[in-house]
Swiss-Prot record:
The lineage of its organism: Bacteria, Pseudomonadati, Pseudomonadota, Gammaproteobacteria, Moraxellales. The keyword Flavoprotein does not apply. This species can form two 3-oxoadipate enol-lactonases in response to different inducers. The one shown is called enol-lactone hydrolase II by the authors. GO terms for molecular function: 3-oxoadipate enol-lactonase activity. It is an enzyme of class 3 (hydrolase). PANTHER family: BLL5160 PROTEIN, HYDROLASE, ALPHA/BETA FOLD FAMILY PROTEIN. Transmembrane segments: none annotated. It comes from Acinetobacter baylyi (strain ATCC 33305 / BD413 / ADP1). Signal peptide: none annotated. This is 3-oxoadipate enol-lactonase 2. Pfam families: Abhydrolase_1 (PF00561). NCBIfam families: protocat_pcaD (TIGR02427). Pathway: Aromatic compound metabolism; beta-ketoadipate pathway; 3-oxoadipate from 5-oxo-4,5-dihydro-2-furylacetate: step 1/1. The keyword Hydrolase applies. One of its GO terms (biological process) is beta-ketoadipate pathway.
Length: 267
């Protein structure tokens, strides 16, 4: 992973957010938001690619990585206002936001409620409503009772295609290990946020440009979910990558090129 330009912790609201920045602060800002059960290290291929061109910010979502784990359950508006607090802390009036899965749902909420803070939003492998509330509540209960090991043991098949699992075992093992070592309470509390989060009725309020990235083989948030977003967001485009759920890791070059195209267009 590239050497940190700066690493710190922001204490805001009820949470201490771990974050890192890369590149020169006077360049256009690009902030990345991780998926459920991962941390900011999932963006290392994006950091390496973009840090010489943009001011890159990565952070650990509350309850993940080195960020603190406030008492849950969490709500999607908390995940969103954590981002606004971080931008305020860094004195960044406007940025491009890129989030994957849970981070993509956070991005949709931000585009609805804080459009003035973003040039555009990139949402990858996500949906306006991810899964069913009952399933998320059941997963939260399972994790609180048994920890993250059972979830981590099966995560790879939800995250990646069989070919990637076979060809890149070190990457798969690293992400699975990070999940197993994470905070069970933080994971469960974010499951509860996902159980309640549903921005479908508000998508038509989004007026800023949105790039939707979907994985052709994603079993969690499907291409149809991405198409639904584009049908309801006025200034949106869909990019489908040959990947499963964690497309930025499985197809980093294609992912980076898709992000760079909108960065060049709207910055």
């Amino acid at each position: 992973m590239p050497v940190f330009h700066f690493k710190d912790t922001l204490t805001a609201q009820d949470v201490a957010l771990n974050y890192a920045t890369f590149g020169q602060a006077d360049r256009p800002a690009l902030i990345f938001s991780n998926s459920l059960g991962t941390n900011l290290s999932m963006w290392q291929q994006q950091i390496a690619y973009f840090q010489d061109k943009y001011f890159v910010i990565c952070y650990d979502t509350r309850g993940h990585g080195a960020s603190s784990t406030p008492v849950g359950p969490y709500r999607i508006d908390q995940l969103g206002t954590d981002v606004i607090a971080l931008l305020d802390h860094l004195q960044i009036p406007q940025a491009t936001f890129c989030g994957i899965s849970m981070g993509g749902l956070t991005g949709q909420w931000l585009a609805i409620h804080f459009p003035e803070r973003f040039n555009q939003v990139i949402v990858a492998n996500t949906a306006a409503k991810i899964g069913e509330a009952q399933a998320w509540q059941a997963r939260a209960q399972l994790v609180r009772e048994q920890g993250l090991t059972p979830i981590a043991q099966t995560a790879a098949t939800r995250w990646f295609t069989p070919g990637f699992i076979e060809d890149s075992p070190e990457i798969v093992e690293k992400l699975s290990h990070d999940l197993a070592q994470g905070s069970a309470e933080g994971y469960a509390s974010c499951c509860e946020a996902l159980a309640e989060a549903d921005v479908r009725p508000q998508l038509q309020r989004i007026s800023i440009p949105v790039l939707v990235i979907a994985g052709a083989q994603d079993p969690v948030t499907t291409v149809a979910d991405g198409q639904f977003l584009c049908e309801h967001i006025v200034h949106s485009t869909l990019e489908v990558l040959e990947a499963s759920h964690i497309s930025n890791v499985e197809q980093p070059q294609a992912f980076n090129h898709a992000v760079e195209a909108v960065m060049k267009r709207f910055n």
